[in-house]
């Protein structure tokens, strides 16, 4: 007899963990685990939900594509859902996919359109009467981010379709990529001017398309490669193609580039031969790929097979195994994270893996070093797990010379010298000194990161400088900084310093309770749990007073999480931090986990505002967040009901329209002065 409560708890944990990794991968471009590790978790959840249907949840990652839409860009619904793909990692799994089609269709399709599985950013470009009108990222599949202005700068994207029989409306799906050679040149330019150096072409492509400043996007070597369509509206009402291979030919006629090496395969065996051929040649291709996508070629068969909640039943991604190369393990250094965990990091002789130079790889914990039998000076095999995260696979014992040395895990913290503690129920070694400089530094970095308050302009580099200089010892100290304070640090000129301070102020006045809970970095408390807590407690005072039993009655909170929350609030240093944050004005009081709280005494309370033009002190999204935090309602269209319009530089037709209606117009400085009233 199965233990349903136990399986229910496991399924809930898997859903939360998969959702967290989806956000890290799709939204933040900072994956923590490999594709293979993600797929192991995903398949476990699929198996649980299949064996016990009562565990099914419509919000489960198995029922959706993955990746919520970021707040910085406008959201828009897809006309037709943009699905993800199911994966296969072996010939047996490819055979099982074919067998499922045999069991579904009376006549089994034998032809498949195959092309490389590109490692870029999936999105949709939309054309009305042959003219490019808009672009959306895949987002969560149902809605995406509007990136029209950015995509207009992509040089190989046709702004007007060529050829004949152009549809009235055409939605083209594809991938934005950066070629390997272009990526190397981009990173060289970035490094030369002290800019961000990207980890891989996918991160560079995703970050470039999501830029609010399209002049930056225009300077990036982006390509759009089309692989399919969404909605198509034609004169005759019926598409003039009956196969996917015909569709690809039509897309090329209209002016789209397509993935390299695409071809029609006339049997499942030919598909597998193509997969093996492309796997052997992947290094010679101009773009990064991580597998092959095989699609049933016949469009009637595609319609008959249909879709699951997550993916088409007529297409499959055949993933390549991770590429492995040899290099030397030069050293192992131990880093201390914000929760005090000591993490060993392999220092490697630099080597190229899958087009990316790798010189470091996490070893996770002491047991991984022991289990793999690693010694300092070893020649090792290295791969990028899931073609993303560097990983030491194993030592090449046969190459040992006798000069290799064992690594001894430290018994004291490498940062503060405190004795290292290892709980019996954990694999991690921890520094439990709350005053440890590394713990403080990493906690502040997390506080302002995208996973915390998301303060633009306060990256790891500037936080490191502030902590090292003694200007900041806790997160609350950030809110005492001035523009002049920041201008003394590297990469902080007058404009960037002013923008960073404005971002801090926006975070202080606009943070939700849920966002602040995330920023505090309470162990085991992620975004979903933070939203749960913010829904059930009116503020941090109420949360602090809740005992373990009360916490256990909340959804998503088990004994381990409840104990971690109590441990955080029982720590005197944390209580002092909360009081300092309260004194700085960062104390959301509304139990709304999804929207900003409204501060009392605001001059903007109840007003309807519109922003137009380019703002200098902050981004448009930050201004919107600050206005809403002050109780205003921000809209995007000009109307007589507007109370005020905030006009930045180069304001255009909306400003003209507002003036013709006699609306009250203010500039960015006046808007900032209205916000200052919040602190009086």
Curated annotation (Swiss-Prot):
Catalytic activity: NAD(+) + (deoxyribonucleotide)n-3'-hydroxyl + 5'-phospho-(deoxyribonucleotide)m = (deoxyribonucleotide)n+m + AMP + beta-nicotinamide D-nucleotide
Domain of life: Bacteria
BRCT domain span: 599-680
Cellular component, GO annotation: cytosol
Co-factor requirement: Mg(2+); Mn(2+)
InterPro entries: BRCT_dom, BRCT_dom_sf, DisA/LigA_HHH, DNA_ligase, DNA_ligase_CS, DNAligase_adenylation, DNAligase_N, Hlx-hairpin-Hlx_DNA-bd_motif
Record: residues binding NAD(+): 35-39, 84-85, 115, 138, 175, 295, 319
Active site: 117
BP term (GO), one: DNA repair
Binding site for Zn(2+): 413, 416, 431, 436
EC category: ligase
Protein keywords: DNA damage, DNA repair, DNA replication, Ligase, Magnesium, Manganese, Metal-binding, NAD, Zinc
Enzyme Commission number: 6.5.1.2
Keyword Ligase: yes
Molecular functions per Gene Ontology: DNA binding; DNA ligase (NAD+) activity; metal ion binding
SMART domains linked: BRCT, HhH1, LIGANc
Coiled coil: none
Role summary: DNA ligase that catalyzes the formation of phosphodiester linkages between 5'-phosphoryl and 3'-hydroxyl groups in double-stranded DNA using NAD as a coenzyme and as the energy source for the reaction. It is essential for DNA replication and repair of damaged DNA.
NCBIfam families the record matches: dnlj, PRK07956.1
Family: Belongs to the NAD-dependent DNA ligase family. LigA subfamily.
Name the record gives this protein: DNA ligase 1
UniProt organism field: Nitratidesulfovibrio vulgaris (strain DP4)
Origin organism lineage: Bacteria, Pseudomonadati, Thermodesulfobacteriota, Desulfovibrionia, Desulfovibrionales
């Amino acid at each position: 007899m199965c233990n349903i409560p136990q399986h229910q708890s496991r399924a809930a944990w898997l859903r939360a963990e998969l959702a967290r990794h989806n956000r890290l991968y799709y939204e933040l471009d900072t994956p923590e685990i490999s594709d293979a590790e993600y797929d192991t978790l995903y398949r476990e959840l699929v198996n649980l939900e299949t064996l016990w249907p009562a565990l099914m949840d419509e919000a489960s990652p198995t029922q959706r594509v993955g990746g919520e839409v970021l707040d910085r860009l406008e959201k828009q619904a897809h006309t037709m859902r943009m699905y993800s793909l199911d994966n296969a990692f072996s010939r047996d799994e490819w055979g099982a996919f074919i067998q499922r089609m045999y069991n579904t269709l009376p006549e089994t399709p034998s032809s498949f359109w195959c092309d490389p599985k590109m490692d870029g950013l999936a999105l949709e470009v939309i054309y009305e009467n042959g003219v490019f009108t808009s672009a959306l990222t895949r987002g969560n599949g149902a809605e995406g981010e509007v990136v029209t202005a950015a995509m207009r700068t992509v040089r190989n994207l046709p702004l007007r379709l060529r050829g004949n029989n152009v549809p009235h409306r055409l939605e083209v799906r594809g991938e934005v990529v950066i070629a390997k050679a272009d990526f190397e040149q981009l990173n060289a330019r970035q490094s030369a001017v002290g800019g961000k150096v990207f980890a891989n072409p996918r991160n560079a492509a995703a970050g470039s398309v999501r830029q609010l400043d399209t002049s930056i996007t225009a300077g990036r070597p982006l390509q759009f490669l089309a692989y399919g369509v969404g909605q198509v509206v034609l004169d005759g009402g019926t598409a003039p193609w009956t196969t996917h291979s015909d569709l690809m030919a039509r897309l090329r006629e209209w002016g789209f580039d397509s993935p390299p090496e695409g071809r029609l395969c006339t049997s499942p065996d030919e598909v597998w031969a193509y997969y093996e051929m492309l796997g052997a040649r992947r290094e010679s291709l101009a773009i990064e790929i991580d597998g092959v996508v095989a699609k049933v070629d016949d469009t009637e068969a595609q319609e008959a097979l249909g879709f699951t909640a997550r993916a088409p039943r007529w297409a499959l991604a055949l993933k390549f195994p991770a590429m492995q190369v040899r290099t030397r393990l030069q050293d192992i250094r131990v880093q201390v994270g914000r929760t005090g965990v000591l993490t060993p990091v392999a220092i490697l002789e630099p080597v190229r893996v899958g087009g990316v130079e790798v010189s470091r790889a996490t070893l996770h914990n002491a047991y991984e070093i022991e289990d793999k039998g690693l010694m300092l000076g070893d020649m090792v095999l290295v791969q990028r797990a899931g073609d993303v995260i560097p990983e030491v696979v194993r030592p090449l014992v046969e190459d040992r010379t006798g000069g290799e040395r064992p690594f001894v895990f430290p018994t004291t913290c490498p940062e503060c010298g405190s004795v290292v503690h290892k709980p019996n129920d954990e694999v991690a070694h921890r520094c439990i000194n709350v005053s440890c400089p590394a713990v403080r530094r990493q906690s502040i970095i997390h506080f302002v990161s995208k996973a915390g308050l998301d303060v633009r302009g306060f990256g790891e580099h500037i936080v490191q400088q502030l902590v090292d200089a003694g200007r900041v010892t806790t997160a609350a100290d950030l809110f005492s900084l001035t523009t002049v304070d920041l201008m003394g640090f590297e990469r902080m000129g007058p404009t960037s310093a002013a923008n960073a301070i404005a971002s801090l102020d926006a975070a202080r006045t606009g943070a939700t309770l849920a966002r602040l809970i995330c920023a505090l970095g309470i162990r085991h408390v992620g975004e979903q749990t933070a939203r749960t807590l913010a829904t059930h407690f009116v503020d941090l005072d109420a949360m602090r007073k809740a005992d373990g039993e009360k916490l256990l009655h909340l959804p998503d909170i088990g004994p381990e999480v409840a104990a971690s929350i109590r441990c955080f609030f029982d720590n005197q240093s944390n209580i002092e931090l909360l009081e300092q944050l309260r004194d700085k004005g960062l104390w959301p009081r509304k139990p709304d986990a999804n929207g900003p709280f409204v501060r009392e005494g605001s001059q903007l309370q109840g007003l309807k505002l519109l922003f137009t033009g380019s703002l200098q002190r902050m981004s448009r999204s930050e201004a919107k967040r600050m206005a809403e935090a002050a109780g205003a309602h921000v809209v995007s269209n000009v109307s007589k009901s507007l109370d005020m319009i905030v006009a930045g530089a180069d304001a255009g037709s909306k400003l003209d329209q507002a003036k013709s209606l006699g609306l009250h117009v203010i500039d960015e400085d006046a808007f900032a002065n209205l916000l200052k009233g919040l602190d009086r």
